[in-house]
Each structure stands twice: as C-alpha cells, then as structure tokens.
C-alpha cells in the first residue's frame, strides 16, 4: 500500500498542468490556479483520499503521457496489483507467456481505452444515449480526416421528437445533439471542437457554432463549444442515420457522442432555482454574524459589511439576488440576467469573484430578497451589522436633496421688509438691507423734511454735488417741494440726455 502511494505521488509530480487539471476535475476538486498550487492540491488529494479509483486515474494519465515507462512499471508490478486493476492491460511477472516479451524486453502495453464522460449541461437534460463516446480515429497521415458514425431511432424516440413543444419556430424542445470532447485525458470532459470541423448529416451539412468576435486587440476569437443540434437533418423514422465528421488531425484525440436531450430555457431553469434553491433568511443572518464575529487574535474588528443592491452584470437594481454557495462574498447578482447570459454564451462564472459558478451551486439569498422589498428604489447600498440587522446607506447627493426638501433650513433666514410710510425701514432689517432701506427712504425723503415730522434726515445718495447746486433757488425749492408731495421725484444722473432713449446693444 505504501509503495503504491509513493508511486502515485511520483507520477503526480511529473504531470503537466492539463493532466493535473483533469485529475482534480475528475475527483470534483477545483482546477484553477498555478502549477505549484495544482501539484500541492493533487498530492494532498492522493494522501488524504487514496482509493483504487484515484490510483487508476493517476496511472491512466501517466500512461497516456509516458507509454513506454508505464509498460516498464506494469511489468514490475506484483501479481496482486495486476489482479486489482485488470483494466490497465498489465501482465503479471512470472506467467511464462512468450507473447509478453520480445527478445527479453517487455512489450509496451497498448494505450488504455479511457472511459470518457461528458460534463452535464444545465440547459440540456439527457433522455437517452444514441451513440456512446466513440473516438475519432485517423485513417492516414493526412491533416484533414473524415470519420463516420451511424445510429437508429426507435419509434418511441421519434414520437418524443415530433410531439415535443417548440422553443421557437422550427426548433423542438426534444432534440438529437452531437457532442465532441477530448480523449487524451480522463474524467469529466467539457465540449471541445477539433480544428477545421464540419458535420454532415445524411449528405447535408449542418450548422456548427462559429467564433465569438474579440474586443481586445491581439486576442484570438473564442469559439463556443456547445452541443450541435442535428435534428432538422435526421430521418425521423426507423431508417439509419449517418453522421460524417470532418476534422483536422493535429496530434490530439477526440471522441464523439450522440444524445437525445430535452432543452430547457432560462425561464425554466429560473423556476427550478426558485423552487429548489432558496436560502432561509435566518441562515443568511447566521452567516453574516459569523463573518462579523469578533476575533480576539485579530487587531482589526469589523463592525459592518456593505453590500450593493446593484447587479454587477447589468448595473441595475437587483430583482432576484443570487450567489454561489462556494463563494465567500455576500455580494449577489441577478439570477434572471445571469441565466439569460449563460443561455446565449455559456461561461458559468461568478461575475463578482470570477470563480466557477455551476448551476447546481446557485442559491437565492432569502434575506436580501426581503431587504429589496422593504427598501425604496433610490437605496443602492446597505450595511449588515454585527447582530445580523441591516441599515440603508445613502450617498451625499441624496442627503443634500433631502436637506433641500426639508422644511427646517440649516442656514439663517434674512427678512427683506418694505419701508414704512414715514421713510424709515424697520430696525431689525436696517443692518441687513442697508442699501435697500436707504433708497426706499429717499423716495419720501423730501416730504418728511418739509413736513417737519420727527426722525432722522434721509439723504439720497444717488444725487451728486452738482445736482444739489443747480437746484438751490428758494422759489424753485418751494415748487419742487409741492411737486414732490404729489409724485416722487425722479432720480437724476450726471448725464443731460434721457436714459430711456439710449439703445443697448
């Protein structure tokens, strides 16, 4: 047991990044990170979860890369190992069969037929397997190869296709799809097209998804590798259907499979998510309290966590807050927009932290759903507190808007009063409105002085010295006094012409 464990660890240390990612993905582990992180993660996996299945996967990966060395290791294995792992095609020592050796040197073992498993897709539910994963075998050394596969439809399968509803005109919800993936590695495989691919169904070429244009300079366009719908070109009867695949042979091995599937829409997936994966608000509060719990060993105490109510995908207010169970953040994204975007361009990546976000791990935040119903539309951010409660966060613009709309002003009020009949302004406004009170008193200044009433003298500051000297005659003063009692005297400037006749440009 110890010798096998050491052997498996040595094999893991010689793996490439792609081999490490395949091994970790086959065992349900994260395959992101640098090579040293992947190696450490794979070694811990071998040490902590050692099993015959894991050892088989490690050996198959190693034999794929080092076929000669794996044959030599297979010849050195004891009989017990060969009995426990017959699928490796390794011959035990001491059998005495001459076919296992050639001139005293053990023959290299043929490459194992790896069991290919395709990753399940949320929008495609497998009903039946029409053609299991089959390797595309090159017939010659030409770069452009052609492979053919055949399959038949049963009457029940034909009825399922014909009686299914339409997603849109001409597209049924029950389809026959073709999927292609790598064969070089083991474990669960994602869809991957070979270069120069072309698919012909019953002598008619079918559509294969093209490349996504890239907005970044110097970045090659990316091709979406999704199942190919071949239903419109099939014989919906018991007649045999033939599929011809043209592909480029550039050293990598591929496998092809055909499935009968039911296609879901983003709305149907959202209904599944809404009925099966909603996190209880009390559980959300417990998680918030755990994050904000005081740590005596930490020098920094967190008193609150701010969460935006704006979806990072579409920059709009959240409708259905959703997040991934494996993510550490509390920030959510809108579930409806997330499913719609993955329906058009499947990436299944968290828009907050860019980590994998498979549909099986999505959940609706029940607490944030209640908060969205209680808060007005203008609130764009909230803060979770240590006791699990929350409070809205308003920015400076909203505070200023509320201050303007409030009835109680924050600044002193200045009263502008009308002068009294005797030409004097009120005492409380004389200091604030000096110019206005003085000019207002000037309109009745002559009348107040001639009448001999009590009070201070009001001086018209708009008149200059020359105007006072011109009007100095006694008879003229009495006439002007009589006129001023009937109507206010017009202000006189230092110009002889009438100001009303001057045109302003």
From Swiss-Prot:
Covalent cross-link site, Glycyl lysine isopeptide (Lys-Gly) (interchain with G-Cter in SUMO2): 35, 56, 68
Biased composition regions of type Acidic residues, renumbered to the chain: 462-485
Catalytic activity: S-ubiquitinyl-[E2 ubiquitin-conjugating enzyme]-L-cysteine + [acceptor protein]-L-lysine = [E2 ubiquitin-conjugating enzyme]-L-cysteine + N(6)-ubiquitinyl-[acceptor protein]-L-lysine
SMART domains: SAP (SM00513)
Induction section of the entry: Up-regulated in response to polyinosinic-polycytidylic acid (poly(I:C)), and interferon phi 1 (ifnphi1).
Gene Ontology cellular-component terms listed: chromatin; nucleus
Compositional bias per record (Gly residues), positions renumbered to this chain: 437-457
Compartments (UniProt record): Nucleus
Occurrences of domain SAP (ranges): 12-46
Span list, region Required for nuclear localization: 374-505
InterPro entries tied to this protein: PINIT, PINIT_sf, SAP_dom, SAP_dom_sf, Znf_MIZ, Znf_RING/FYVE/PHD
GO biological process: negative regulation of type I interferon production; negative regulation of type I interferon-mediated signaling pathway; positive regulation of double-strand break repair via homologous recombination; protein sumoylation; regulation of transcription by RNA polymerase II
Cross-link (Glycyl lysine isopeptide (Lys-Gly) (interchain with G-Cter in SUMO)): 35
Post-translational modification: Sumoylated. Lys-35 is the main site of sumoylation.
Residue stretches of biased makeup (Basic and acidic residues): 395-407, 493-505
Short sequence motif LXXLL motif: positions: 20-24
Keywords tagged on the record: DNA-binding, Isopeptide bond, Metal-binding, Nucleus, Transcription, Transcription regulation, Transferase, Ubl conjugation, Ubl conjugation pathway, Zinc, Zinc-finger
Domain note: The LXXLL motif is a coregulator signature that is essential for transcriptional corepression.
Known function: Functions as an E3-type small ubiquitin-like modifier (SUMO) ligase. May play a role as a transcriptional coregulator in various cellular pathways. Catalyzes conjugation of SUMO2 to KAT5 in response to DNA damage, facilitating repair of DNA double-strand breaks (DSBs) via homologous recombination (HR). Mediates sumoylation of PARP1 in response to PARP1 trapping to chromatin. Negatively regulates induction of interferon phi 1 (ifnphi1) mediated by mavs and ticam1/trif.
Protein name, UniProt field: E3 SUMO-protein ligase PIAS4-A
This protein's encoding gene: pias4a
């Amino acid at each position: 047991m110890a010798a096998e464990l050491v052997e498996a660890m040595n094999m893991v240390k010689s793996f490439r990044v792609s081999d490490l990612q395949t091994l970790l993905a086959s065992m349900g582990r994260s395959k992101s990170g640098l090579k040293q992180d992947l190696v450490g993660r794979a070694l811990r996996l071998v040490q902590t979860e050692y099993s015959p299945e894991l050892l088989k996967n490690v050996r198959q990966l190693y034999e794929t890369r080092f076929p000669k060395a794996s044959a030599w290791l297979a010849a050195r294995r004891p009989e017990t190992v060969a009995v426990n792992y017959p699928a490796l095609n390794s011959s035990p020592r001491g059998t005495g069969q001459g076919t296992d050796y050639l001139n005293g040197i053990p023959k290299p073992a043929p490459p194992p037929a790896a069991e290919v498993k395709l990753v399940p897709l949320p929008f495609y539910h497998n009903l039946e397997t029409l053609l299991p994963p089959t390797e595309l075998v090159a017939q010659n050394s030409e770069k452009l190869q052609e492979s053919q596969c055949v399959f038949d439809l049963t009457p029940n399968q034909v009825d399922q296709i014909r009686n299914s509803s339409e997603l849109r005109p001409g597209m049924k919800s029950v389809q026959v799809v073709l999927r292609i993936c790598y064969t070089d590695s083991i474990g669960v495989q994602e869809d991957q097209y070979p270069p120069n691919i072309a698919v012909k169904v019953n002598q008619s070429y079918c559509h294969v998804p093209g490349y996504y244009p890239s907005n970044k300079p110097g970045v090659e366009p990316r091709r979406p590798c999704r199942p190919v719908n071949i239903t419109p070109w099939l014989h919906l009867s018991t007649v045999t259907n033939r599929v011809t695949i043209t592909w480029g042979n550039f050293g990598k091995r591929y496998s092809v499979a055909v499935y009968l599937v039911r296609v879901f829409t983003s709305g149907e997936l959202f209904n599944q998510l809404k009925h099966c994966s909603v996190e209880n608000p009390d559980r959300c509060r417990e998680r918030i309290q755990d994050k904000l719990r005081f740590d005596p060993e930490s020098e920094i105490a967190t008193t609150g966590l701010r969460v935006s109510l704006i979806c990072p995908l579409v920059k709009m207010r959240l409708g259905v807050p959703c997040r991934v169970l494996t993510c550490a953040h509390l920030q959510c994204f809108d579930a409806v927009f997330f499913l719609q975007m993955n329906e058009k361009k499947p990436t299944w990546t968290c828009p907050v932290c860019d980590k994998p976000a498979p549909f099986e791990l999505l959940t609706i935040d029940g607490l944030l759903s209640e908060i969205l119903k209680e808060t007005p539309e203008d609130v764009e951010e909230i803060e979770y507190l240590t006791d699990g409660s929350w409070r809205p966060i308003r920015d400076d613009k909203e505070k200023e808007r509320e201050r303007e709309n409030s009835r109680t002003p924050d600044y002193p009020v200045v009263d502008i009063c009308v002068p009294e009949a005797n030409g004097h302004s009120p005492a409380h406004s004389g200091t604030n409105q000096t110019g206005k009170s003085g000019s207002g008193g000037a309109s009745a200044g002559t009348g107040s002085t001639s009448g001999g009433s009590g009070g201070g003298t009001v001086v018209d500051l708009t008149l200059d010295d020359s105007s006072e000297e011109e009007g100095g005659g006694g008879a003229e003063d009495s006439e002007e006094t009589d006129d001023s009692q009937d109507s206010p005297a017009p202000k006189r400037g230092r110009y002889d012409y009438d100001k009303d006749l001057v045109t302003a440009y």
